[in-house]
C-alpha cells in the first residue's frame, strides 16, 4: 500500500505527501506500532512527511466509540486497565496541523494541541454523562501488547506542558462531541 502511494506520488510529481502515523510507532511493541514504524521509514526515505498523531478524540473504533455503542445496546463494558493514560487531539486540531504543515518536506510532524487523559477518568466521565450502571462493567487487566502511556516523538523536546484533562474537562468534551456528532446525525 505505502509503496504504491509513493510510486504514484513520484510519477505525478507530488510536491509533498503527508502519511498519517501514530505515537504507537515510537518504540513499537505490537504489530500495529511496528507496521506504522516501517511505513514511516519508507515515507521518510523518499523525502515525504509523516504526521505522527495521537488518538483522535472519539474516532470510529476508539475506546469511547466502543463504550458508547456498548452502553446504547445495554451491554457490559469491557475495560483493559484503568491506570493507562492516553494522549488525544480533536479532529479540528489535526486538520489545522496538516494544512499548516503541507509544505514541510521530509519531516515528522507532531500534533500542536494535545491533551492527556487517564482511562479511569474517561470511563467515570462517560458513565456519568450516560448514566450507566457501573456494575455492568468488568476489567480485563493490562495486556502485554499495550503501554501504560505512549511515547511522543519529541517527548524530550517539549517546550510546553501537556494539559491533563480532569473529569470536569472530559465531561464537557464528551457533551460537546455528543452534541456535534450524534445529535447532528438524527
Per-region residue spans from a language model:
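Strand-loop microenvironment adjacent to phosphate/nucleotide-handling motifs in alpha/beta enzyme folds
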Residues: 11, 41-43, 47-50, 55, ...
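Residues at alpha-helix caps and immediate loop-helix transition turns in enzyme cores, especially N-
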Residues: 1, 30-31, 63, 122
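Conserved Rossmann-fold NAD(P)-dependent oxidoreductase catalytic core, especially the SDR/UDP-sugar
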Residues: 2-37, 48-49
Amino acid at each position: 500500500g505505502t509503496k504504491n502511494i509513493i510510486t504514484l506520488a513520484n510519477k505525478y510529481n507530488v510536491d509533498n505527501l503527508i502519511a498519517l502515523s501514530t505515537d504507537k510507532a515510537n518504540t513499537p511493541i505490537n504489530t500495529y506500532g511496528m507496521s506504522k514504524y516501517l511505513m514511516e521509514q519508507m515515507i521518510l526515505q523518499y523525502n515525504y512527511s509523516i504526521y505522527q498523531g495521537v488518538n483522535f478524540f472519539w474516532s470510529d473504533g476508539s475506546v469511547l466509540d466502543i463504550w458508547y455503542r456498548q452502553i446504547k445496546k445495554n451491554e457490559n463494558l469491557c475495560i483493559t486497565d484503568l491506570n493507562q493514560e492516553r494522549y488525544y487531539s480533536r479532529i479540528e486540531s489535526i486538520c489545522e496541523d496538516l494544512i499548516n504543515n503541507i509544505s514541510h518536506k521530509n519531516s515528522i510532524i507532531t500534533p500542536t494541541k494535545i491533551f492527556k487523559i487517564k482511562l479511569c477518568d474517561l470511563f467515570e466521565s462517560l458513565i456519568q454523562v450516560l448514566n450507566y450502571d457501573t456494575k455492568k462493567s468488568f476489567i480485563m487487566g493490562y495486556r502485554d501488547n499495550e503501554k501504560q502511556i505512549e511515547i511522543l516523538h519529541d517527548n524530550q523536546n517539549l517546550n510546553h506542558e501537556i494539559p491533563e484533562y480532569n473529569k470536569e474537562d472530559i465531561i464537557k468534551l464528551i457533551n460537546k462531541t455528543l452534541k456535534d456528532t450524534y445529535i447532528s446525525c438524527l
